[in-house]
Amino acid sequence: MTPSEIHADERLVHVPLGERAYDILIGPGLIGRAGGEISARLKGRRAAIITDEHVAPLYLEGLMDGLQTDGIEAVSLTLPAGEKTKSFEHLVTVCDAVLSARVERNDAVIALGGGVIGDLAGFAAGIVRRGVRFVQIPTSLLSQVDSSVGGKTGINTRHGKNLVGVFHQPDLVLADTAVLDTLSPREFRAGYAEVVKYGLIDKPDFFFWLEKNWDDIRTGGPARIEAIATSCQAKADVVVADEKENGVRALLNLGHTFGHALEAATNYDSKRLVHGEGVAIGMVLAHQFSARLNLASPDDAARVEAHLKAVGLPTTMKDIPGELPPVETLMAAIAQDKKVKGGKLTFILTHGIGQSFVADDVASSEVQSFLSEKHPG
């Protein structure tokens, strides 16, 4: 069988990774066609669907029906929603469910959900039988443009976010844009922060386009699919150039060093801060820190902050509800960042909008002094 033809309102992004190459399909109605798209690409006839309690009532039945129609026998596991599900405890639960479903190497684990479910299910797919097929059906904007693409999987520990995991590329990504209409405005904005990130890394024209087209993206106009496709292509290009994050892929972590520290500081409490909001604040801080180090103009930092604020995203630590722990606690979280090498702090800094770079010898004293100025305490 061959994959179905791309519809007029869809986009396809191909990720050319040799034997591990895969397609990202972007457009409305893809969940209903998932069975056909999967069966056209994978030999296996079994699947284990991993989802969460928020997504399951909306899309699980439709996905199961579609798989059955195309001859794929599927079972499902529904987990609690939220960042705390990315744990060893739930990883064991997922692995047990996949093995109980008798999923073999040519069969598939299907992640139906946002980034949490994708990271967790992908980790399980990477280690069960030393690797089974994996299909991402991301249901949030953030997961459609970021976490579903590139093969990073993992869980959180008490030491920090995403510190235990494997690289396991998906075999197919189905980004059904129709599901985005069910997201809360807050969740949609949080995902949009990752869209902005691609412009700030090395695509200034994309950032300027986003400034003009945010309203059309928000309301589901033609710019929405264009923004998602551009983001997926940007990430695919980086992943192909540096799959295992030994070089340029680290640029995708713009805003994430500060952001992850803030997530840890709020104990991953989504009522206070969700991942995309942490990234938004982190990107502003990265631009401000770059300006402080005389690497970039303060005007660029102000422009980034202005756009994110206009969208409705938090842009300062003061925007986070509740008290934050002291700067020393934030510094301890930063010291656990995956990009730390030889004990030296590594940040993604910038020379301006669309001019990000890896700075691999940042003085901790400079970071601590900067955070002390920005800390609301």
Curated annotation (Swiss-Prot):
Binds 1 divalent metal cation per subunit. Can use either Co(2+) or Zn(2+). InterPro entries: Dehydroquinate_synthase (IPR050071), DHQ_synth_AroB (IPR016037), DHQ_synth_fam (IPR030963), DHQS/DOIS_N (IPR030960), DHQS_C (IPR056179). The lineage of its organism: Bacteria, Pseudomonadati, Pseudomonadota, Alphaproteobacteria, Hyphomicrobiales. The keyword Cytoplasm applies. This is 3-dehydroquinate synthase. Keywords: Amino-acid biosynthesis, Aromatic amino acid biosynthesis, Cobalt, Cytoplasm, Lyase, Metal-binding, NAD, Nucleotide-binding, Zinc. NAD(+) binds at G115, V116, I117, G118, D119, T139, S140, K152, K161. Its EC number is 4.2.3.4. It is found in: Cytoplasm. Belongs to the sugar phosphate cyclases superfamily. Dehydroquinate synthase family. Its cofactor is NAD(+); Co(2+); Zn(2+). GO terms for biological process: amino acid biosynthetic process; aromatic amino acid family biosynthetic process; chorismate biosynthetic process. Zn(2+) binds at E194, H256, H275. Pfam families: DHQ_synthase, DHQS_C. Catalyzes the conversion of 3-deoxy-D-arabino-heptulosonate 7-phosphate (DAHP) to dehydroquinate (DHQ). One of its GO terms (cellular component) is cytoplasm.
